[in-house]
């Protein structure tokens, strides 16, 4: 577990090294490339997926040796999905602190600079790139759904604890597709009532054969 703690801490340290000077100077600093964005998502969340998978295999379940690597890979992508949602949902708040997790290299492809994301009128220019990252997040969420399918049916609590963040994540992506994320006044998030509804639905789904796969398929982002 110390290894994974170190990875998470290393992500936070890199965060401070990258963005500390920008925050102090009142400027906005962006991650340089998509590879650095992916590395950040791995360090702060993908590594948690590895730790969670390791603990599950040691204490709650078993898989054939040839399936374990696949399980870990999907666990990493599960964590990355949740971190990507945080990044894509919290753009205005991060910008206020001088942090832009949207890679500068990608922004340049659309003739944008990090500062341009401070103006919500630039949403139309930003939308194509933003949709690319929502698509990537959906791919990670699909891996998370496949991860859940690998969990034993008898492990109700384990499945439920994985299903709820995926259901909320799927719904969040759907909301982010249509809202203006650059408008700091338009806070985009899943409501408490929706979360309570998902909690009830997933409990029913766990009791019905095939219910888990159905609810996760029905709930995924289909807005494109």
Question: How does the language model describe each region?
Answer:
Residues 89:
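Active-site flanking residues adjacent to catalytic metal/cofactor-binding acidic residues
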Residues 1, 5-81, 92-224:
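Catalytic cores of Mg2+-dependent Asp-rich isoprenoid enzymes
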């Amino acid at each position: 577990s110390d290894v994974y703690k170190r990875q998470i801490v290393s992500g936070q340290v890199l965060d401070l090294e990258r963005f500390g000077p920008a925050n102090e100077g009142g400027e906005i600093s962006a991650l340089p490339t998509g590879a650095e964005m992916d590395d950040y998502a791995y360090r702060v969340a993908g590594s948690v997926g590895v730790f969670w998978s390791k603990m599950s295999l040691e204490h709650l379940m078993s898989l054939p040796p040839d399936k374990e690597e696949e399980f870990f890979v999907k666990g990493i992508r599960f964590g990355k999905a949740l971190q990507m949602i945080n990044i894509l949902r919290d753009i205005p708040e991060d910008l206020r602190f001088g942090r832009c997790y949207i890679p500068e290299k990608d922004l340049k492809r659309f003739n944008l600079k990090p500062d341009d994301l401070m103006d919500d009128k630039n949403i139309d220019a930003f939308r194509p790139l933003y949709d690319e990252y929502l698509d990537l997040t959906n791919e990670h969420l699909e891996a998370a759904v496949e991860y859940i399918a690998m969990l034993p049916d008898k492990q109700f609590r384990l499945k439920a604890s994985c299903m709820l963040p995926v259901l909320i994540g799927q719904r969040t992506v759907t909301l982010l597709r249509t809202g203006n994320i650059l408008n700091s006044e338009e806070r985009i998030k899943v409501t408490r009532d929706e979360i309570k509804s998902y909690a009830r639905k997933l409990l029913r789904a766990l009791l019905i054969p095939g219910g888990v796969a159905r609810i996760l398929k029905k709930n995924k982002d289909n807005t494109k």
